[in-house]
Amino acid sequence: MLVKICGVARPEDVALLDGLVDYIGFIVEPSSPRSVEPRRLGELVRLVRESRPVLVTASLPPAEAVDLAASLGIPVVQHHGSLGDGHFSYAEERGVALAPVAVYRRGADLRAAVSQLLSKPHEYVLVDAEKGSRERYEGGLKIPLQALAEVAHMGKVALAGGITPENAHLVAALRPYMVDVASGVESSPGVKDPGKVKALLRALGRLSG
């Protein structure tokens, strides 16, 4: 099971996570408290030696996000907006992989949404809760465990949505391709907590002791 920690905004957090997790996500999104300006993004990405950096955005036009990633040597763009076939082709031309996002909405067909995205060229497909959703399910997860279980084994699917060290065992039991955590390992927005990171990795079976 792979692990991505998202919303990394400080050099010391890059140092903490590099090589410990598989993906490090950097958010370029003005509305996010974890957002990193493009200039600082380049400085942070240069510190990554072992993990795979990801540019995460919703409001940047897909081609612009791909261009920014390519210019900084970031191999993956996780885009929370709508992606057309042309965006996937353009990313491929620029040597950047896309990670599209399927959003859980009560009553909608999550499996169909994930299946459609998996049919496109992808680094992984992220399953996440709606932004700002206050719904809480088992253990504080933002997506029902049953819904996660239905998509966990469909392919390169990453599960997100309220995952913390305390509930990570519920998600780990589904044996997904990857889990994606941001606020669940923070002491404050954009500040990763080393103790919480290690507790998460222990809950996911990635660290012993």
Curated annotation (Swiss-Prot):
Transmembrane segments: none
InterPro entries found in the cross-reference section: Aldolase_TIM, PRAI_dom, RibuloseP-bd_barrel, TrpF_fam
Catalytic activity, EC: 5.3.1.24
GO molecular function annotation: phosphoribosylanthranilate isomerase activity
Catalytic reactions on record: N-(5-phospho-beta-D-ribosyl)anthranilate = 1-(2-carboxyphenylamino)-1-deoxy-D-ribulose 5-phosphate
CDD domains: PRAI (cd00405)
Biological pathway: Amino-acid biosynthesis; L-tryptophan biosynthesis; L-tryptophan from chorismate: step 3/5
Coiled coil: none
GO biological process: L-tryptophan biosynthetic process
Superkingdom to which the source organism belongs: Archaea
Record family assignment: Belongs to the TrpF family.
Protein name: N-(5'-phosphoribosyl)anthranilate isomerase
Organism of origin: Pyrobaculum islandicum (strain DSM 4184 / JCM 9189 / GEO3)
Lineage summary: Archaea, Thermoproteota, Thermoprotei, Thermoproteales, Thermoproteaceae
Gene of this entry: trpF
